[in-house]
UniProtKB/Swiss-Prot annotation:
Domain of life according to the entry: Eukaryota
Membrane protein topology class: Peripheral membrane protein
Phylogenetic placement of the source organism: Eukaryota, Metazoa, Chordata, Craniata, Vertebrata
Presence of keyword Transport: yes
Renumbered residue ranges of the record's region Disordered: 306-327
UniProt-recorded name of the protein: Vacuolar protein sorting-associated protein 26A
Compositional bias of kind Polar residues: 316-327
Localization terms from the record: Cytoplasm; Endosome membrane; Early endosome
Length: 327
């Protein structure tokens, strides 16, 4: 499959074709404006190779240049400071020395076993992207073609995946015990748990479980946190009684979350929390947040072929928001 470029002037069109484009899997990513883009999918350590085709549209014309190159770029862009993009990967291959083009040409390129340390990501305030960039250097205006790729980071975890179990409450009014079966979930996993009411002296009208995503960008005083409720699961509608136990089952596959991303290049983090919310008859809201880790599980076929995918996270701490009264 070809990546068709636009016209850079009336003379030349730049086109990039990957060597394994006919067999390589593609992945989708939602952009900041809500549109869905589809690009070829790569993993950490995979090589990227193909051809750069320069097609002349007007035979007989000449294109003078100061050199032709292709780059593999990994870049982080903060939307509130678009002038300050940070490249954490930049590999360059020179395709041609200074000269002139008088006819269509093709150039082979290969970036061997490219390190791709982070997952592609587009959020509310930040974008992490990988792309190929072809530049025809000219005296006045360079001709440039950028071509996006998508990178997924695959994680493996040991068999030990502790459950989360806590007792919370309001003194002499409400005392509940909640339990989630794991603390780390892959993106297609099911969150299974239960809520057990030990003491109920206030009238609970409604109870739900929320999956909350927090995107933290910047450092120090310039830190910005964007909070989004990814999923809501109604646990009960009505008053519980002492001794009642209510099951929880939340399917993550229906919500398309990203993996947890911790301190990516000291620029941003993406963290996920389970938020247990209770609403009483006076519409007061009580809650308890617990951080969980989301990770991308390697497909079975890929797990058998490759054993070098491993991504570790620090043990998360439970964190509660100050926006609402905590149980």
């Amino acid at each position: 499959m070809s990546f068709l470029g636009g016209f850079f002037g009336p003379i030349c069109e730049i086109d990039i074709v990957l060597n394994d484009g006919e067999t390589r899997k593609m992945a989708e990513m939602k952009t900041e404006d809500g549109k869905v883009e589809k690009h070829y999918l790569f993993y950490d350590g995979e090589s990227v190779s193909g051809k750069v085709n320069l097609a002349f549209k007007q035979p007989g014309k000449r294109l003078e240049h100061q050199g032709i190159r292709i780059e593999f770029v990994g870049q982080i862009e903060l939307f509130n400071d678009k002038s300050n993009t940070h490249e954490f990967v930049n590999l360059v291959k020179e395709l041609a020395l200074p000269g002139e083009l008088t006819q269509s040409r093709s150039y082979d390129f290969e970036f061997m076993q490219v390190e791709k340390p982070y997952e592609s990501y587009i959020g509310a305030n930040v974008r992490l992207r990988y792309f190929l960039k072809v530049t025809i250097v000219r005296r006045l205006t360079d001709l440039v073609k950028e071509y996006d790729l998508i990178v997924h980071q695959l994680a493996t975890y040991p068999d030990v995946n502790n459950s989360i179990k806590m007792e919370v409450g309001i003194e002499d009014c409400l005392h509940i015990e909640f339990e989630y079966n794991k603390s780390k979930y892959h993106l297609k996993d099911v969150i299974v748990g239960k809520i057990y009411f030990l003491l109920v002296r206030i009238k609970i009208q409604h109870m739900e479980l929320q999956l909350i995503k927090k995107e933290i960008t910047g450092i120090g005083p310039s830190t910005t946190t964007e909070t989004e409720t990814i999923a809501k699961y109604e646990i009960m509608d009505g008053a519980p009684v002492k001794g009642e136990s209510i099951p929880i089952r939340l399917f993550l596959a229906g919500y398309d979350p990203t993996p947890t991303m911790r301190d990516v290049n000291k620029k941003f983090s993406v963290r996920y929390f389970l938020n247990l919310v209770l609403v009483d008859e006076e519409d007061r809201r009580y809650f308890k947040q617990q951080e969980i880790i989301l990770w991308r599980k390697a497909p079975e076929k890929l797990r058998k072929q490759r054993t070098n995918f491993h991504q570790r996270f620090e043990s998360p701490e439970s964190q509660a928001s100050a926006e609402q009264p905590e149980m």
